[in-house]
């Protein structure tokens, strides 16, 4: 499959929504076209980096670990050299001590240099923190100890039916490992999304962007999180009508 085919379908983004109700008088103004385009571009570039990494190393990214297997840096650091735009992450990647923890004397100052692709477009967050997270748990992309390949996912639920990254309800330090959302298909999902325009977003592994409504069906979203559950998600149960996308 060509990169153009993988990323041909990219939905219009508007931002993210908090799971808790927004207090009256605190609603943000409607997103501008520029903000929508920027949010779309961030997630598109992130998924391109995922596939570039997979093409180079044979599996999707995961947290970087030390010689004993202990995670020391997030996958967000690992994919820096694989962003399509020249120099988008190469120079920053070279600054990291890849054999040291995220909060070491060398690596901790680099938290402040978080790339724009991880920054919220409209939602406030502390410097160096991102809402873009994956799911870690049984059957999810970032299941600990698993190296997921695109061929495995394509032969199971399919990349178009599987979520890679989602806008989470809580931000995390972008370089910190083991910072993805704990996932157990038998337990309720945590709050997802942040305060924008009544929806939040997820990037599917085919590169398309899914808009998710506030009152999404939880079981349908869980089906989209697993890579080999055998389900074809009913997108209408979690995504707003086409006219509102």
PLM region descriptions:
Residues 1-5:
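Positively charged n-region of N-terminal signal peptides that target proteins for export
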Residues 7-18:
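Hydrophobic membrane-insertion alpha-helices, especially the h-region
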Residues 18-25:
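Boundary at the C-terminal end of the N-terminal hydrophobic targeting segment
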Residues 26-245:
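Internal low-complexity, small-residue/proline-rich segments
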